[in-house]
Amino acid sequence: MSTVELTQELTLALSVKDRAKASQWYQTHLGFNEVVSIDEAGWTEMTTNVPGVTLGLGDTDEVSPGNCVPVFGVKNVAAARKALEDVSVKFDGDTMTVEGMVSLATFYDPDGNALMIAEDLSS
């Protein structure tokens, strides 16, 4: 049995210099659709043609290749975080919440790769 139970949702988070330009590129070339863009959060989400997989575009001043961070959906981010911390998984800072949207936390695998867990607060 796994430490946490994941939902059937996965967000691939990419850092981009220009979210509007990046969104248009993904729409034009890959057929993705923009579903939400929140300027205050510096975040845009797009549906992909893969069920349960969302592309997230986050603002950054400097992009470095290979910056993809998988964001795994969970039913309760606080419970999932506690379960992972209980088995010594390292987290980066506090859990962040954007009211009415998402609650998320960043953690690391044994090689230092960043991963995230996220609870959907929109419903």
Question: Which functions belong to the PLM regions below?
Answer:
Residues 1-5, 14, 81, 85-123:
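Vicinal oxygen chelate
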Residues 1-23, 52, 68-70, 121-123:
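N-terminal beta-strand motif that seeds the catalytic metal site of vicinal oxygen chelate
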Residues 13, 43-45, 54, 71, ...:
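Short hydrophobic/aromatic beta-strand element in the GNAT-like acyltransferase core
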Residues 20-22, 38-44, 97, 123:
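Short glycine/proline-centered loop/turn elements that form peptide/ligand docking sites
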Residues 22-29, 84, 112:
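Conserved active-site tyrosine of GNAT-family acetyltransferases
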Residues 31-37, 91-95:
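Short secondary-structure junctions
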Residues 33-68, 114-120:
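Conserved short beta-strand elements that form part of the metal-binding/catalytic scaffold
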Residues 69-84:
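Mid-chain, well-packed structural core segment of small domains
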